[in-house]
Design a protein with these regions (language model features):
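Short, low-complexity Pro/Thr/Gly
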Residues: 1-175
Length: 175
């Protein structure tokens, strides 16, 4: 960890207490909540904005970029609107992702059996094309992938960020 201190003893300390032949495992109750963070600066094309994560909890797990798209006619809008995303801790760059890498990662790692891709027509958004193609719930979440050149109003989309601590709760980043 770059940021290390007395507050993360529950995460980094020895989680076992041994008395003779019995092992008692220590655990801490927790809950998960989505907390919206705001950007510093104005969001526009080719602009750089930053968001400071507030200390409203103990850990950071999943992160999403929320965007109101309006009417678009560009495939994979969410990933294509991102040039790069940088994670800095204490002014030191820890991780950096590019929009085209995020698109490739989503295509390679999201299988149908995971339940991420919607299977019913009720959970799909039509692209407006006559060829019967649909933008699935995952494609909507991962930035409207597969949308044809026809203009579509997807409303709010959520682009999942793929930092190491977003992959499972055991890797969550302590605040």
């Amino acid at each position: 960890l770059v940021a290390y201190g007395a507050q993360d003893i529950y995460l980094t300390g020895n989680p076992q207490i041994t008395f003779f032949k019995v092992v008692y495992r220590r655990h801490t109750n927790f809950s998960m909540e989505a907390i919206e963070q705001t950007f510093n600066g104005s969001v526009a094309a080719s602009s750089r904005v930053s968001a400071t994560i507030s200390r409203n909890g103990d850990l950071v797990h999943r992160m999403y970029l929320e965007c109101n798209t309006g009417t678009i006619n560009k495939a994979n809008y969410g990933h294509s609107m991102i040039d790069n995303i940088v994670l800095e801790i204490g002014g030191q760059q820890i991780d950096k992702h590019y929009g085209h890498w995020m698109e490739t990662w989503a295509e390679l790692t999201e299988p149908n059996p995971s339940g991420v891709v919607a299977t019913s027509l009720a959970n799909m958004v039509t692209t407006g094309a006559d060829d019967g193609t649909y933008a699935t719930k995952f494609q909507r979440m991962a930035a409207a992938g597969g949308v044809s050149a026809v203009s579509v109003d997807l409303g709010m989309i959520f682009v999942p960020l793929q930092f190491w601590f977003c992959r499972n709760p055991g890797l969550a980043l302590p605040l």
